[in-house]
């Protein structure tokens, strides 16, 4: 086959092991998955009720415009419906963005380490990837990113809060950055974890009215607990949305996914409960880190913590796995002596912390 040359050296995404697989390998009867930043509280009771009672005509294609969901999200953020695009998770939106803006004559600027799909999709399109190392505390080096922009740059990526460090960039700093970015360079503000920031920041959505070169990406996979439904969305100026719709598959979000997302966004009381539970979980890990000088906890603003224990990441990962907890090794994320742990329920956090204390 005459594969694209840009695929040379790339590999497919490797998801973590399934719980059943780990239990069989290690002879465990119970295991807790804290590796994929899923919501430990599940999803809204309203979503559960819709799921139980929903009758979806599986032989009929879904609404390709996601009309009802579009109306709900537009009303929630006080946006125009044409300022939204819905995709099969943010992953698909990232793919669409690289497809319309990147090729082998362009480059893209991003932090490192950050969400791996920016780099992967850019390389598939043949673009040059300019990676700017994070600062020592895990913050984006915004000045370094600005310096990397040149006449061939078409996309700049900012994951906020950043995955895997959890650092959050304040709105004023984002605006100061955007003021310096050329107007023909698209800035992607990936806010998959924004709902977890405590206290909730000033709304970012209206940035698109001031900066026509910005798209904000959001998801129903994290705090809304709809990871398997695969519903993500972008907020941007109509011109950006129109260009993305040219390459968007016609029926890319499912009927059931659209219905569940509508119920999910209606139940903000559940979202607030999740945010509070998550904030309390972060405090548990902060208290743990203060007890040990050798432990570095990166600023946590998502639903996960990145903890550097000064011990080889694979050792930490295997130790926790053998004791019934699947986490994410920092070795694959650019942090060779750290692990990323999804914030769980209070008792799950306590159990993991107790294990880490024994390891230290």
From Swiss-Prot:
<protein>
    <recommendedName>
        <fullName>Histidinol-phosphate aminotransferase</fullName>
        <ecNumber>2.6.1.9</ecNumber>
    </recommendedName>
</protein>
<dbReference type="InterPro" id="IPR050106">
    <property type="entry name" value="HistidinolP_aminotransfase"/>
</dbReference>
<dbReference type="InterPro" id="IPR004839">
    <property type="entry name" value="Aminotransferase_I/II_large"/>
</dbReference>
<comment type="similarity">
    <text>Belongs to the class-II pyridoxal-phosphate-dependent aminotransferase family. Histidinol-phosphate aminotransferase subfamily.</text>
</comment>
<feature type="modified residue" description="N6-(pyridoxal phosphate)lysine">
    <location>
        <position position="222"/>
    </location>
</feature>
<dbReference type="GO" id="GO:0030170">
    <property type="term" value="F:pyridoxal phosphate binding"/>
</dbReference>
<dbReference type="InterPro" id="IPR015421">
    <property type="entry name" value="PyrdxlP-dep_Trfase_major"/>
</dbReference>
<dbReference type="Pfam" id="PF00155">
    <property type="entry name" value="Aminotran_1_2"/>
</dbReference>
<dbReference type="GO" id="GO:0004400">
    <property type="term" value="F:histidinol-phosphate transaminase activity"/>
</dbReference>
<keyword id="KW-0368">Histidine biosynthesis</keyword>
<keyword id="KW-0028">Amino-acid biosynthesis</keyword>
<comment type="subunit">
    <text>Homodimer.</text>
</comment>
<comment type="pathway">
    <text>Amino-acid biosynthesis; L-histidine biosynthesis; L-histidine from 5-phospho-alpha-D-ribose 1-diphosphate: step 7/9.</text>
</comment>
<keyword id="KW-0808">Transferase</keyword>
<keyword id="KW-0032">Aminotransferase</keyword>
<keyword id="KW-0663">Pyridoxal phosphate</keyword>
<dbReference type="InterPro" id="IPR005861">
    <property type="entry name" value="HisP_aminotrans"/>
</dbReference>
<dbReference type="InterPro" id="IPR015424">
    <property type="entry name" value="PyrdxlP-dep_Trfase"/>
</dbReference>
<dbReference type="GO" id="GO:0000105">
    <property type="term" value="P:L-histidine biosynthetic process"/>
</dbReference>
<dbReference type="InterPro" id="IPR015422">
    <property type="entry name" value="PyrdxlP-dep_Trfase_small"/>
</dbReference>
């Amino acid at each position: 086959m005459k594969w694209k040359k840009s695929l040379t050296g790339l590999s497919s995404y490797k998801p973590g092991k399934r719980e059943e697989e780990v239990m069989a390998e290690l002879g465990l009867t119970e295991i807790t998955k804290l590796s994929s930043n899923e919501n430990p509280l599940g999803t809204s009771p309203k979503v559960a009720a819709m799921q139980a009672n929903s009758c979806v005509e599986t032989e009929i294609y879904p609404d390709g415009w996601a009309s009802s969901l579009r109306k709900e999200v537009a009303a929630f953020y006080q946006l125009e419906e044409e300022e939204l695009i819905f995709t099969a998770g943010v992953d698909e939106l990232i793919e669409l963005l690289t497809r319309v803006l990147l090729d082998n004559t362009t480059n893209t600027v991003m932090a490192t380490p950050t969400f791996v799909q920016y780099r992967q999709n850019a390389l598939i399109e043949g673009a040059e990837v300019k990676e700017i190392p994070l600062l020592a505390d895990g913050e984006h080096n915004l000045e370094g990113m600005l310096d990397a922009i040149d006449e061939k740059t078409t996309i700049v990526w900012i994951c906020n809060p950043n995955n895997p460090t959890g650092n959050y960039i304040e709105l004023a700093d984002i605006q100061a950055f955007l003021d310096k970015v050329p107007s023909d360079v698209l800035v992607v503000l990936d806010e998959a974890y924004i709902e977890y920031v405590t206290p909730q920041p000033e709304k970012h959505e209206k940035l698109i009215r001031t900066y026509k070169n910005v798209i904000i990406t959001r998801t129903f996979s994290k705090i809304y607990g709809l990871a398997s439904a695969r519903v993500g969305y972008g907020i941007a100026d109509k011109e950006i949305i129109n260009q993305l719709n040219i390459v968007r598959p016609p029926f890319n979000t499912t009927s059931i996914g659209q219905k569940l997302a509508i119920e999910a966004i209606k139940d903000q009381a559940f979202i607030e409960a999740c945010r509070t539970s998550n904030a309390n979980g972060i405090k548990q890990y902060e208290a743990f880190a203060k007890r040990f000088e050798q432990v570095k906890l990166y600023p946590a603003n998502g639903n996960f913590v990145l903890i550097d224990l000064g011990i080889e990441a694979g050792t930490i990962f295997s130790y926790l796995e053998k004791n019934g907890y699947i986490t994410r090794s920092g070795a694959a994320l650019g942090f060779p002596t750290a692990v990323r742990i999804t914030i769980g329920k209070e008792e799950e956090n306590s159990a993991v912390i107790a294990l880490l204390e024994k390891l230290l």
